């Protein structure tokens, strides 16, 4: 039941976009059509599922105070937590290159449509934010970290695909000239955020 609760909360209550505003640059830039948004959303899910459990292991066995005690008593008091940002980003950047090569090889059309935003997953704050939240919340095991990664990724994917679908519909609407483009997009995102706020009072 704890896993189900964590999964649902990470999608709706603690949504990366609407609760923490993480990954907004690519969220706004790549949400012009559903197909491209779906591709980036799946890439973000894959990155979170791969990197967050790896960073959990890195945090548990290397970074936290006393984590290196398995190397011997002389390492029992070593605290490498100050290296969290650097090492988390290194793991994320390494696997971003792998994802980029896979997408370029097997999905060239998607690779072309995503453009610079695919390699920029390496510095997507939603990916890094997932690892930092994992560290802050001190999950009890790697299973919780994996469930949180999956839920957070699905939440981000849901947000970008929903916005892309709305923006496709808006392209056929008579939007006032002063609000066309990013203006009406900001209003739409704000209304979506208000809708997701309804989940924040739910206790799971």
Which residue stretches match the model-derived regions?
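Cytoplasmic-side transmembrane-helix entry/capping segments in multi-pass membrane proteins
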Residues: 36-46, 86-88, 110-121, 176-184
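Hydrophobic core segments of alpha-helical transmembrane domains in multi-pass membrane transport
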Residues: 22, 26, 44-53, 89-98, ...
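Helix-coil boundary and interhelical linker segments in multi-pass alpha-helical membrane proteins
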Residues: 1-4, 59-82, 131-146, 201-204
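Structural signature of hydrophobic alpha-helical transmembrane segments
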Residues: 5-18, 78-92, 147-159
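Ordered, amphipathic secondary-structure segments that act as subunit-interaction surfaces
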Residues: 60-114
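Generic transmembrane alpha-helix signature in multi-pass membrane proteins
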Residues: 21-29, 101-106, 117-118, 125-139
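C-terminal ends of transmembrane helices
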Residues: 22-36, 96-110, 163-174
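C-terminal transmembrane helix-loop-helix hairpin of multi-pass membrane proteins
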Residues: 5, 140-204
